[in-house]
UniProtKB/Swiss-Prot annotation:
Any one cellular-component term (Gene Ontology): extracellular region
Species: Cyriopagopus hainanus (Chinese bird spider)
Tissue: Expressed by the venom gland.
GO molecular function, one term: ion channel regulator activity
Record has Signal as a keyword: yes
Subcellular location: Secreted
Protein name: Hainantoxin-XVIII.2
Amino acid sequence: MKLSIIIIVTSLVIAVVAFPSKDSKAIENDKTEQRMEIVVQETARACSKQIGDKCKRNCECCGKTVVCGTIYVGGKEVNQCMDKTSDNAILNGLGKGMNFIENTFSFCV
């Protein structure tokens, strides 16, 4: 019985100390009082580009196994819609499966 009372009292003391009152003023650099503004950008919801077209997101590319992939042309990074992942037929099939899974989790409408 005494142990349970000690545990309850200790818990209440910790709760009172841990949670500051609403009347307390925030310190200038107090991280709990800083606010962040989140900017939501409009993204493509339906496909508009075919294989070989430049893209920014998977949702822009048409096709279940087509993703917005990165290739390097003359040392520059270029994003374009692609579905081929390898010259090997088995690896290409596995790559298309992975592309399908990636598109599934892109949540394009």
